[in-house]
Amino acid sequence: MTLIHMNILMAFSMSLVGLLMYRSHLMSALLCLEGMMLSLFVLATLTILSSHFTLANMMPIILLVFAACEAAIGLALLVMVSNTYGTDYVQNLNLLQC
């Protein structure tokens, strides 16, 4: 495993630790999820380029599409929670049920 792969895996694990530590605020959780998705994108791109696996060239693009959808839904949820309750606590998400 090269140094670049180890750095990317460390970035992913630090984002995961940040998600576990700062899970009370929705904005912090969304930022950690974005860090995880970006490190997965870079890792997938490097793996595909180094292995010359041409059939999986679209996988990083699909991963970015899912990351953009996750970010849009997360930001919409953040706006709804902050407009309704004035804070971005994750515990307020249980109160949004019908």
Swiss-Prot record:
Protein family according to the UniProt entry:
Belongs to the complex I subunit 4L family.
> What PANTHER family does this protein map onto?
NADH-UBIQUINONE OXIDOREDUCTASE CHAIN 4L (PTHR11434:SF0), NADH-UBIQUINONE OXIDOREDUCTASE SUBUNIT ND4L (PTHR11434)
Q: Which terms under GO biological process does the entry name?
A: ATP synthesis coupled electron transport
Checking InterPro entries in the record gives:
NADH_UbQ_OxRdtase_chain4L/K, NUOK/Mnh_C1-like
Q: Which residues cross the membrane?
A: 1-21, 29-49, 61-81
Gene Ontology cellular-component terms for this entry are: mitochondrial inner membrane; respiratory chain complex I
Q: What is its EC number?
A: 7.1.1.2
Summarize subunit and interaction data from the UniProt record for this chain.
Core subunit of respiratory chain NADH dehydrogenase (Complex I) which is composed of 45 different subunits.
Q: What is its main location?
A: mitochondrion
Q: What's this protein's function?
A: Core subunit of the mitochondrial membrane respiratory chain NADH dehydrogenase (Complex I) which catalyzes electron transfer from NADH through the respiratory chain, using ubiquinone as an electron acceptor. Part of the enzyme membrane arm which is embedded in the lipid bilayer and involved in proton translocation.
Q: How does it sit in the membrane?
A: Multi-pass membrane protein
The name on file for this protein is NADH-ubiquinone oxidoreductase chain 4L
Q: Which residues form a coiled coil?
A: none
Catalysed conversion reaction: a ubiquinone + NADH + 5 H(+)(in) = a ubiquinol + NAD(+) + 4 H(+)(out)
Keyword terms = Electron transport, Membrane, Mitochondrion, Mitochondrion inner membrane, NAD, Respiratory chain, Translocase, Transmembrane, Transmembrane helix, Transport, Ubiquinone
